[in-house]
Structures are given as C-alpha cells and as structure tokens.
Amino acid sequence: KKKLRKLSENKQPLASVVLICHNEETRLLSCLWSLCDNECDFPIEILAVNNNSTDRTEAVMQQLGVTYFNETKEGPGHARQCGLNQAKGKYHICIDTDTIYPSRYIKTHVKQLMKPGVACTFSLWSFIPDERHSATGLWWYEALRDLHLRIQSIQRPELCVRGMTFGFNTELGRKFGFRTDIIRGEDGSLALAMKPYGKLVFIHSGKARVMTGYGTLNNDGSLFNSFKTRLVKAFKGAGSMFTRKNEYKDEDNNLIKNK
C-alpha cells in the first residue's frame, strides 16, 4: 500500500503500467504485489481499470489504494483503451490481473522500447502447475509452443503478441487505439497496426517471462487435448508462417456484435 501511494506521486512517469480487471478480487493483490516489487531506476505509474466487475474488485482496489478508473463497457478492448486514455507515461505496459510478473519485467521491456525504431515489445509466459497440469507436461508444452512462437515471430510477430506481455510506445498506440469490436486479439491487432512504424521486438529473456492462469488452455479439457488442438492448428498454418501479412480477416465468432 505504501509503495502504491508513493508511485501515485510520480507526475511524469516514464512508463505507465496498466492492469485490466474483471472480477479479479482474489488475484488483484498478488498481481499488484509482483508489480510493486519490480526493480525500476526510472519513474513509473501503476493504474488499474475496473471493467464492469460484479464482485469486490473495486473494494479491493480502494483498500489497496491503487489509482483506478471504471470502464462500464465490458471487454478487454474497452478496458485497455480506458487505461491508454489515462496513461501519462511515454511507454505503456499492458498487464493482466491473473498474472504474476518477475522483478525485472518492467525494466526489461522499457529498455527495449527506448531503443530507436522500436514500436512495441512482447515476451513469453508460463503456467503454474496444479492438480490438472503437471510440471513435466507443462514444460514440454511450453517448450514446443515457444519454438513455434519463435519461428512465427520472424514474419508474423503480431500473432505472438498477448496482452499480458505487451508493451508499446504510448503516442504511437494512441494513434490507432485498441479495437473494441472483437472478443479477443485487440493486442495483436494494435501490434499489427504499429508494424509499419517500427520494430516488434520479441523478448526471449526469462526476466520478462510471466506466470499466468490457464485461460483458454482449459477450454479443450486436458493438457494433452490442448496440445493436440494447437498442434493441428499449427500444422495447418505452417506454410503461412514464412510469409508476411499486413491484414487479417475477422472471424465471425470473434466479433462482439455477433456474440
């Protein structure tokens, strides 16, 4: 709480670290704890966006003293855009509340963003082992997934971007804004829009590797089924990974108006 209060006093932060929260009362504290423990030798601000939560998320925000804003239009695009509108930093670091960040995460991203010609940065993520997901199974899954992402990033880095590990130049991000008409992919869409204006830097370092929840990984049931589903999808699109693409057609089931 003291660290959050001190951070709120930074009137000219170099980086804005922005969480989006929808019903995250049980995860908010651990996420903020990891962010407050980050080692930074430059001023930052930590902002949170309460995205139409129906649990005690807002009450926890008030109790912790984090600077936050309410966004009543539900969806990650709306929440991230709200945070972008409020950010004061030259660089913008996107944060998911169900994720834990290593102590040099912010510094590692900002160091790359400060290099000439860099538009955005993105990094890798791991999952926390539990009763449904063994450490060994996750190791193999992540190793093969990381290999796929490294190959894919050569020509189509925008497809490797995830909002929980995404940073960018704030001014450039505001030029395009986050898409609010899609259910997922607002982060990669913004990265694609920024692609002609600078490099999309893939950070492989463990200093920027986060620990996150399972999200869509659980939609396919077991870890094996998740791996099989993604492997089939990867093989189907293997040829296209080696060609650049500047535009993607929206899938009907990903459009909010059809939801």
Question: Where do the language-model regions lie?
Answer:
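N-proximal low-complexity "stem/linker" segments adjacent to membrane-targeting elements
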Residues: K1-S34
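Short, acidic, metal-binding catalytic loop of nucleotide-sugar glycosyltransferases
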Residues: W33-P43
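A conserved acidic beta->alpha catalytic loop
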Residues: S34, N50-E58, T99
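Glycine-rich, basic loop-to-helix element that forms the pyrophosphate-binding segment
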Residues: E71-A87
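Conserved donor NDP-sugar-binding/catalytic core segment of glycosyltransferases
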Residues: R104-A135
